[in-house]
């Protein structure tokens, strides 16, 4: 833990620097809410007669609608009952929005952000995750969900939707087969 805290501190500094250098405004939105966001698969944590936020999205979108064109937030979020390799009930979330940006713009932001932070924290633009070296530059693999499922699960969820089968096949058939040496983005979720 002692070794991780200075790295976390450098990462948080790099995240803020990335957005500040690009003209984003850092915002803080409420953590304790009168009512939880209506999320089908996400349970909010109660806090007395209020709820802890699961995401700052709703309040940030109000700021965006109010005229702030580029905003970001780093802060605590809470999700009840989520604990595992990829989930913890309390965590720090980064969320950002740009007026008039589409998902390809946000994907470009993400690519630049990860390379920027890796360089700032590690001194290079590649990293090792679970023993696998991942090059953050120059290219990222990009597949549609339909392409990935057709290739590794043998069906197309865009034309044959089955929510239970989708979740199971994503975890058991698609994710294990995705390339490991570069970041992979699945687009066009049904």
Language-model features: locations:
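Class II aminoacyl-tRNA synthetase-like tRNA-binding/catalytic domains
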Residues: 1-105, 115, 165, 190
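Short, contiguous, pocket-lining structural segments
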Residues: 7, 102-109, 137-144
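Short amphipathic alpha-helices in soluble, non-transmembrane regions
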Residues: 111-113
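Metal-assisted phosphate- and nucleotidyl-transfer catalytic regions
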Residues: 116-190
């Amino acid at each position: 833990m002692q070794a991780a805290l200075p790295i976390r501190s450098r990462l948080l500094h790099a995240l803020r620097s990335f957005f500040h250098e690009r003209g984003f405004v850092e915002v803080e939105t409420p953590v304790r809410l009168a009512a939880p966001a209506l999320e089908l698969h996400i349970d909010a944590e109660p806090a007395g007669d209020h709820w802890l936020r699961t995401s700052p999205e709703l309040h940030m979108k109000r700021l965006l609608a109010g005229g702030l064109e580029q905003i970001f937030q780093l802060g605590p979020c809470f999700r009840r009952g989520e604990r595992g390799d990829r989930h913890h009930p309390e965590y720090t979330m980064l969320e950002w929005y740009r007026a008039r940006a589409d998902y390809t713009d946000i994907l470009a932001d993400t690519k630049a952000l990860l390379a920027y932070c890796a360089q700032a924290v590690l001194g290079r633009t590649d990293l090792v995750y679970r023993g696998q070296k991942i090059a953050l530059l120059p290219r990222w693999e990009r597949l549609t969900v339909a392409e990935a499922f057709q290739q590794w699960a043998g069906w197309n969820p865009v034309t044959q939707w089955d929510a239970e089968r989708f979740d199971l096949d994503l975890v058991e058939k698609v994710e294990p087969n995705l390339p490991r040496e570069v970041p992979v983005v699945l687009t066009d979720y049904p």
